[in-house]
């Protein structure tokens, strides 16, 4: 009899505390006026509801969960009660990651994050100084790098993350050197989502061939002390995917939307992913269990037969499914409204893994 315990199921909550931000990045997926923000008591109630639901799932299915909270914005450091929010999340046993532009981080904030504790911090960095400042605003590069150094000094694990487009994809080697020189432990990458302000950059999206070339190059780097990571499901389909060293990473189970994660917006609205901004409920008024089980949107995301184009025929569907947010945003740009279309940057053959 096999008594081996099942592996913990990685499940993440991405909680956006605010859509306020001190920057106005050209590729940002946010649009429109900032919504109402949940109060600290409302956030505490939401976190408890999430925790209770995950505990119930674990007992019902006899599978241990490894839940994580990605806390972000907007710029989460604009919340004056951030410390209290993080403590509420930590007290429920969640692993916490903070996603920030890094420009507001100083010694005191770094010490606070380390004391919670926050497990890791992602700082957005789009390339060398002139490229980063073109995308995120003059002076933001220096502030972000200084913020990362404060985090490292406080003993936190730091990831630089670059949003790839034709504006900055050619600078990936520079980012390797920059990240290694700054002493960060990880360098991550994702793709431009042509949504919100980012919709104006649709002409800067990488072609499928360019996407593949950049990903192959990125995952082939071997720099002591620096790990290459990404949440992009397409990365798992590159020829380098099987050669990743320990500490490097990409999603083995494909796009997380509807499968292994959910997003909570500042007012409590639930969506499959922040960049796939289709409301499916509200954490303050709806049962997370009911939303997860019965949402038509989530169930469509889990059904291969509902997908369109290459994704509907692909032998790698269960390991990839493309980025649903990019597929959706691209469909909107073409006058459609379909989150189940094929990923427009897909570079894999439908019948085979590369």
Q: Which residues make up each language-model segment?
A:
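Conserved alpha-helical substructure of the radical SAM core
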Residues: 1-119
């Amino acid at each position: 009899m096999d008594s081996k315990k099942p592996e913990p199921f990685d499940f993440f909550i991405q909680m956006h505390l605010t859509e306020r931000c001190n920057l106005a990045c050209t590729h940002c997926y946010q649009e429109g006026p900032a919504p109402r923000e949940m109060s600290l008591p409302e956030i505490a109630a939401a976190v408890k509801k999430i925790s209770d639901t995950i505990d119930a799932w674990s007992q019902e299915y006899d599978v241990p969960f490894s839940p994580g909270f990605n806390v972000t914005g907007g710029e989460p450091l604009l919340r004056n009660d951030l410390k209290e929010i993080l403590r509420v999340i930590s007290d429920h046993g969640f692993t916490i990651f903070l996603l920030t532009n890094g420009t507001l981080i100083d010694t005191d904030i770094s010490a606070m994050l380390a004391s919670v504790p926050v497990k890791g911090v992602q700082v957005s960095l789009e390339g060398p100084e002139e490229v980063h400042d073109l995308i995120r605003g003059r002076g933001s590069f220096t502030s972000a790098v200084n913020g990362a150094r404060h985090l490292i000094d406080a003993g936190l694990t730091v990831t630089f993350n670059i949003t790839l487009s034709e504006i900055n994809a050619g600078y990936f080697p520079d980012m390797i050197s920059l990240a290694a020189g700054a002493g960060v432990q990880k360098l991550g990458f994702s793709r431009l989502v042509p949504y919100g302000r980012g919709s104006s950059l649709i002409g800067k999206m990488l072609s499928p061939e360019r996407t593949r070339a950049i990903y192959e190059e990125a995952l082939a780097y071997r720099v002591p002390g620096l790990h290459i990571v990404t949440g992009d499901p397409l990365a798992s389909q590159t020829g380098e995917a099987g050669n990743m060293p320990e500490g490097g990473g990409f999603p083995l189970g494909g796009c997380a939307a509807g499968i292994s994660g959910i997003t909570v917006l500042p007012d409590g609205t639930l969506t499959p992913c922040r960049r796939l901004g289709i409301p499916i409920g509200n954490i303050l008024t709806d049962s997370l269990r009911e939303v997860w089980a019965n949402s038509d949107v989530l169930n469509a995301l889990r059904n291969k037969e509902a997908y369109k184009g290459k994704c509907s025929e692909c032998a790698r569907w269960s390991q990839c499914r493309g980025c649903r947010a990019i597929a959706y945003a691209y469909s909107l740009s073409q006058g459609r409204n379909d989150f189940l279309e094929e990923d427009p940057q897909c570079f894999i053959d439908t019948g085979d893994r590369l």
